[in-house]
């Protein structure tokens, strides 16, 4: 109940019990909580693992974290930790200082949300995020849905794996639910001259 109040207060969305069936959190037939409710709760068994490496081959650990709890909590903890991993370089020209990060914050946010919302929760493995000095890699279980190609994704074809979860994240204004996330990542990275994410 405390998590429900926190979500309602932070995102201004009503998650009261009379909305559970419509949101896909309870079954209409037996009034039992659904797997989606478990994933969104603090009892969620899935985790997000982030590792920072000293080398290109990602074998020499510099630091690592594993975040559990609800996927909302995992999102918040992961985004905060990734912000620490996102190096900032400052340059001074005359009297003006310019700060530049390795990766746009919005691109990191989109990639993380994509990994959380579209992963296959029938697998028990964790979302894996690998970071080194040259890349930030997001690995989410499940792969592309049958019939979808990477080119479809680049074009903005939207086919959510977890429809009810996508609807909830859309209500929370965390995602657009319109297939724009991947295109936005590519656009943001192209602005800092990363052409093949």
Language-model segments: residues:
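Active-site helix-to-loop segments that bind/position phosphate- or nucleotide-bearing substrates
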Residues: 1-4, 8-123, 131, 136, ...
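Glycine-rich phosphate-binding loop
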Residues: 2, 161-166, 170-188
């Amino acid at each position: 109940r405390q998590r429900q109040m926190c979500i309602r207060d932070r995102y201004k969305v009503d998650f009261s019990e009379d909305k559970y069936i419509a949101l896909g959190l309870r079954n209409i037939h037996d009034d039992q909580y659904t797997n989606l409710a478990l994933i969104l709760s603090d009892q969620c068994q899935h985790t997000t693992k982030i590792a920072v490496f000293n080398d290109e081959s990602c074998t020499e650990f510099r630091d690592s974290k594993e975040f559990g709890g609800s996927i909302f909590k995992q999102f918040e903890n992961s985004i905060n930790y990734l912000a620490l991993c996102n190096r900032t370089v400052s340059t001074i020209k005359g009297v003006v200082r310019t700060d530049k990060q390795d990766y746009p914050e919005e691109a990191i946010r989109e990639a993380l949300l994509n990994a959380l919302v579209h992963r296959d929760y029938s697998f028990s493995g964790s979302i894996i995020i690998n970071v080194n000095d040259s890349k930030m890699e997001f690995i989410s279980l499940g792969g592309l849905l049958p019939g979808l190609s990477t080119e479809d994704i680049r074009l903005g074809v939207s086919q959510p794996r977890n429809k009810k979860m996508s609807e909830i994240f859309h209500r929370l204004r965390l995602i657009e639910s319109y297939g724009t996330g991947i295109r936005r990542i590519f656009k943001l990275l192209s602005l800092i001259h990363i052409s093949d994410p």
